[in-house]
Amino acid sequence: MADYRKTLNLPDTAFPMRGDLPKREPGWIAAWQQQKLYQKIRKAAAGRPKFVLHDGPPYANGNLHLGHALNKILKDIIVRSKTLAGFDAPYVPGWDCHGLPIEHKVEVTHGKNLPADKVRELCRAYAAEQVEIQKKEFIRLGVLGDWDNPYLTMNFANEAGEVRALAEMVKAGYVFKGLKPVNWCFDCGSALAEAEVEYADKVSPAVDVGFPCAEPDRLADAFGLAPLTKPALAVIWTTTPWTIPANQALNMHPEFDYALVDTGERYLVLAHDLVGACLERYGLNGRIVATCKGAALDRVAFRHPFYDRLSPVFLGDYVTLDAGTGVVHSAPAYGLEDFQSCRANGMQSDDILTPVMGDGRYAPDLPFFGGMNIWKANPEITAKLREVGCLLAEAKITHSYMHCWRHKTPLIYRATAQWFVGMDKPVADGSTLRERALRGVEATRFFPAWGQSRLHAMIANRPDWCISRQRNWGVPIPFFLHKETGELHPRTVELMEEVAKRIEQEGIEAWFKLDAAELLGAEAAQYEKISDTLDVWFDSGTTHWHVLRGSHNDGHVEGPRADLYLEGSDQHRGWFHSSLLTGCAIDGHPPYNALLTHGFTVDQQGRKMSKSLGNTILPQEVSEKMGAEILRLWVASTDYSGELSISKEILDRVVEVYRRVRNTLRFLLANTADFDIAKDAVPLEQWLDIDRYALAFTRQLAQQAEADYARFEFHRIVQALQVFCAEDLGAFYLDILKDRLYTTAAGSQARRAAQTALWHITQTLLKLMAPILSFTAEEAWAVLNPGKEDSVMLHTFHALPAQEGEAGLVARWETIRAVRAEALKVIEALRTEGKVGASLQAELELRLTADKYTAMQSLGEDLRFVTMTSRATLLEAASAEAEAIVATPSARTKCERCWHYTDDVGHNAEHPTLCARCADNLYGAGETRTHA
């Protein structure tokens, strides 16, 4: 008996069903490195329009976490998609290498008493070691880039470039020295940037403190009263008793009503609206004697509770009635608004009291509290206030308070002499940096759009930028200050260039070991060489000035403006922010055309990842157990504009999506294995109707996906690929196509037409998925191109052949698909009843009206192939009510080869188990098909 199975064109491919990703992926990475794929892509893309995604440098400290993986995978998807879209899209990874965390690591390992030059040497070595660790982990994620030549902020050329960027800002007039309150961490021993501050709950003492009036007659006049007969106190409320030794003024709102309250032994000055709450807090009875506006109390002097000095009233619009007394105590060294108020009222910088030292202790010469830690001094200060009779109430409150992001310890505002970039100082063209930056925000595209208003608000409300730090491991601020006047050397910009040249050769150590006389000659005796270093946000914030201008081999030759910066949403106050300020200061515009922000990773319940919750997922573990491809697909399938949920269950669902795509790809490869596009292609006009429809819906997918890539909406692409593989192909086109692919003659026009369509579909699918499923696309591409050292990334998105009348074709086939879906439901009901197994055991009768009838009639004899039944009869229904689809089990004979049930099985006596169609396909001229 003949084995007709061997006569079928059964699919065959070297592309395995199982991805076995954890084992196979390292091999692809090794192949890319061996082939120098990144360099090949650069060569292939030379001369195309440029697209530059400038890498925001991760900090060179510790292994990668999921946030790192998310960020780098998103960048890789964008760079790959831009390459496939026809751009020259280089990707130069970078690392942020200076700063306190690395210095802290070195101190922990080697102790705090090392010489400064040794600290810098160890920091540089540690950062280099961390870069190598992170680099390997990024490469394992399938990220393509110039990994052999990354940019590091500690590269000598970049350190020199940073000094030159600072020189540009000095030359423009933005940089000044000033005494201002800055975020200060006692553990860091340094000022902190806004981006290094986080908020957490803190329990603080809350005290109500009376300041005795030093000018009772003026106070009486303000309230329209005769001279007062007993003491009067203005009462303040504060949660920072430690600032009271530095008090130098009181603030009242000019428009608020203030009351003079008689409590028996003395008068209290309180905001009128808060009198009741205050008296209850103090356990006192009292009556309001008189009221006046805050403006009437301007400059009235009160006495410090325990020091012999005055605290005048300064008016301030920032005073509120939300809590407290309506009177604010002002310690200008330890509060931004306090500082601004006192300076606006004529207080000179030299007059501002700064008793708190950098380590958190009071200066030794401070009366009563000298040498004490400020936090430990709070109860001592409260006791002193009680002793002098000025403590009216005390309590404990829990409130949100600023903390150091590294040490998790409370911060203070502390006025120190620092270097600043001025936000509101007009420069040569009359504009301020704030104005330039706000215009820059408005000119930038944001993904998602809400990022614009967020960054705009931050720029509008931010203070001057404190760019100096008091640390060892950082790029120096190479200034010489006159020892008597404190002024910068008149040749500062010129001297900075000389320093930059030395740093270019020797690194930052060139400045720290420099003898001033080498540059200043005889003038050196008059000048002091400062030791401050630059804020690390200035490091990364100026990479557009040196990395993109060509300090790196892949410099963006068109200039320092990148097409895109992409980071987490916290970088609105970090890298996006500092880059915007430096770009606008130096070039007058942002260093980027667009900003893309992504959210943070959370677990399935929306909780942050933490070891204590046990919900941490490491990218290394996912790569080892499931494959980096699954992590890439998870990133792409999630809407990154908000929080990104991840868990074992979520990743398992991603695996199912991957399997669907892989199985579809395997079918396509298996059924085009014997097809050569150069020899076997069938012209489009000779394709069957359903093949032209498949071309049309593939074109729709390609157009939509390419548009979504351009908009960075990758989750829409993954959704579309799922629908395409599962519904358009798997449940429709490929399902119908199997009969033609397997049963017609191998070289028949009907089969070759199908294979031509499948070849175009495969090319399209592979290139659309390549930015996301990079390993799998490469694996499939190798199967398509055996023996060639080729890569899908050396090509561009597939150009599908054009065809006329596509809209009408699609509309007709959408109707056919809708009818087919209803027919399959009817057959499924028959299967559920146990009357048929496969759909080929059924016969259909379709009674349809108008458009449906016309669409199905257009299929002619091929109708049964579309419905996947052995027979399909079409009748025209008189009305919608008369429409029906009826399925019945076939009573005919099953063909051994094609499994259709027909009356002509055995028609050919030599092949008694074959239907006439199969006999003709095997031994005759072969069947003719026109539609399916």
From Swiss-Prot:
Q: Where is this protein found?
A: Cytoplasm
Q: Which GO terms describe its cellular component?
A: cytosol
Q: Which UniProt keywords apply?
A: Aminoacyl-tRNA synthetase, ATP-binding, Cytoplasm, Ligase, Metal-binding, Nucleotide-binding, Protein biosynthesis, Zinc
**What stretch or stretches form a coiled coil here?**
none
User: Can the keyword Transit peptide be found in this entry's annotation?
Assistant: no
Q: Which residues bind L-isoleucyl-5'-AMP?
A: E567
- Primary location: cytoplasm
Catalyzed reaction equations = tRNA(Ile) + L-isoleucine + ATP = L-isoleucyl-tRNA(Ile) + AMP + diphosphate
Tell me a Gene Ontology molecular-function term this record carries. ATP binding
Q: Where is this motif: 'KMSKS' region?
A: 608-612
**Stored Pfam families:** Anticodon_1, tRNA-synt_1, zf-FPG_IleRS
What is the required cofactor set for this protein?
Answer: Zn(2+)
Motif extent ('HIGH' region): 58-68
UniProt-listed GO biological process terms = isoleucyl-tRNA aminoacylation
Origin: domain of life: Bacteria
- Which residues are listed for Zn(2+) binding in this entry? C895, C898, C915, C918
Q: Where does ATP bind?
A: K611
Q: Which CDD domains match?
A: Anticodon_Ia_Ile_BEm (cd07960), IleRS_core (cd00818)
- Tell me how the cofactor is bound: Binds 1 zinc ion per subunit.
Asked if the record carries the keyword Protein biosynthesis, the reply is: yes
Question: What is the purpose of this protein?
Answer: Catalyzes the attachment of isoleucine to tRNA(Ile). As IleRS can inadvertently accommodate and process structurally similar amino acids such as valine, to avoid such errors it has two additional distinct tRNA(Ile)-dependent editing activities. One activity is designated as 'pretransfer' editing and involves the hydrolysis of activated Val-AMP. The other activity is designated 'posttransfer' editing and involves deacylation of mischarged Val-tRNA(Ile).
Q: What is the protein's quaternary organization?
A: Monomer.
According to its UniProt record, which protein family does this protein belong to?
Answer: Belongs to the class-I aminoacyl-tRNA synthetase family. IleS type 1 subfamily.
UniProt domain comment: IleRS has two distinct active sites: one for aminoacylation and one for editing. The misactivated valine is translocated from the active site to the editing site, which sterically excludes the correctly activated isoleucine. The single editing site contains two valyl binding pockets, one specific for each substrate (Val-AMP or Val-tRNA(Ile)).
Q: Which HAMAP family match?
A: Ile_tRNA_synth_type1 (MF_02002)
Protein name, entry field: Isoleucine--tRNA ligase
What taxonomic classification does the UniProt entry list for its organism?
A: Bacteria, Pseudomonadati, Pseudomonadota, Betaproteobacteria, Rhodocyclales
